[in-house]
Amino acid sequence: YGVVAQMFAFLIPAPLLLFLTGGRNYTFARTESRYLVLACGLILLTLITFSLVYAALDIKPSQLAYLDMKDILKNKGAFLFLTAIIVPAYEEWIFRGLLFGILVTESTRRREAVFATIFVSLLFTAVHIEGAHSLSALPPIFAMSIVLHLMTWKSGSLWPSFCAHSLQNLLAASTMLAAAAKSAAR
C-alpha cells in the first residue's frame, strides 16, 4: 500500500494547489504531434542508454519488486490500465502540471526553469524510491523526469510527457508481468 498512500498524500493538497495557482499550470492542452513523437523517442533513448550502461557495468536491477506480484497476475488488464494510464496521468498532473507549473511561468528565466526542473525531478525520484527496490533504478527515473519536464516546458502541454510516461510504464509493467509469470511458473 506504500505507492497508494503516496498517491493520496499528493492528492490531498492537489485541489488546494490548483485553487492557489488560479489554474496557472500546465494542462492537457492540444499540442503538436511532433512533441509527442519526440517525447516517446527521448524516453526510449533514455531507457536504451541506461540499459546499455547497466549491461556494460553488469548492474542488475533487484527482482524483489517482481516476486510479490502473484496477485497482479490475476488481473493483468487492470494492472496495465492502472500502470500505463491512470498513474502517468496523475503523476504528470501533479509533478509537471501543478508543481512545475507553480515554479515556472511564461516570465521565468531559463536558469530558474532548470532549477525548478531539477527540484521537481528530485521530488519525482524520491516518490519512486520505495517502488524502485534498487538504487540503480533511481538515475533512469531522474533522467526520465528531466526529459518529461523539458517536453512539458517546450510544448506547453502535458500530452507529450503523459504519452512518453505511459509508454515507459507500459514497458516496465510488461516486463514486471513477464518476470512475475516466469517466477510463478517455477
Where does each model-flagged region fall?
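Hydrophobic alpha-helical membrane segments
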Residues: 9, 46, 143-147
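Juxtamembrane helix-loop-helix connectors linking adjacent transmembrane helices
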Residues: 1-2, 21-87, 105, 180-186
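Structural signal for the C-terminal ends of transmembrane alpha-helices
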Residues: 15-25, 151-155
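Alpha-helical transmembrane segments in multi-pass membrane proteins
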Residues: 1-21
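Alpha-helical hydrophobic membrane-insertion segments
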Residues: 8-15, 37, 52, 114-115, ...
